[in-house]
Amino acid sequence: MATDVKSENLVLRLWFLMHRDVGLFRLCEDQAYGEKGLTMEQFTVLAAVKQIGPPAGIIQIAKWIGRSPNSITMIVDRMVKAGLVRRTRDRTDRRMVNVTPTSKAENLFALAIPAGWKFINKVMSPLSQEDRLTFARLLETIRYEAFEYLNPGENIKAMVAGDDKSHIKMAERLFHDVMLSAPQGKRHVGKKKL
């Protein structure tokens, strides 16, 4: 019986830590991105649009971020008012709304990427490469269990395969964007290789 109590206490501790850390990370991201003119939510929507490929639908953005379409619609409403995105009706399905970033958003996003990257590296710096890989696998395991809870009977293996491809693609794009945003990266843009 004592083992069950210890086990349950550990589960509650992990749950509490996850919630608390997510909140803390969001505050840090808001600060880092805020210095560049974006909120964490705005940055995340722009990252989703960039990953999906503009234009991106509200439902696509919501799925990519892991939020409800209603919450994304409210964020996009505020982004439209701030001049960060344009909203258009899909030509093939008028019920669908697409989101495209403005040049203002593109500029702010480019400035915010290095700030976010600096924060991410700072937070992850105490972890070895092996610890990071283990941490990623553990978080993915929990994510897939949560996905299965919300979507009983869905093909989790297909989701895992899709996530693997998506993560590689996203990492390549973010690395490219970070390098172009860095001062040394800007010097090499447009130069021909000999």
Question: Which residues does each PLM region occupy?
Answer:
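Terminal interaction helix/tail motif
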Residues: P114-L194
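N-terminal leader segment of winged-helix/HTH proteins
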Residues: M1-K36, I168-L194
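Charged, amphipathic alpha-helical coiled-coil/dimerization segments
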Residues: D77-E140
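N-terminal helix-turn-helix DNA-binding core of bacterial DNA-binding proteins
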Residues: L27-S68, A82, E154
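Pre-recognition alpha-helix immediately N-terminal to the DNA-recognition helix
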Residues: R13, L17, L24, C28, ...
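Short, locally clustered residues in the helix-turn-helix/winged-helix DNA-binding domain
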Residues: H19, A47-G53, I113, E140
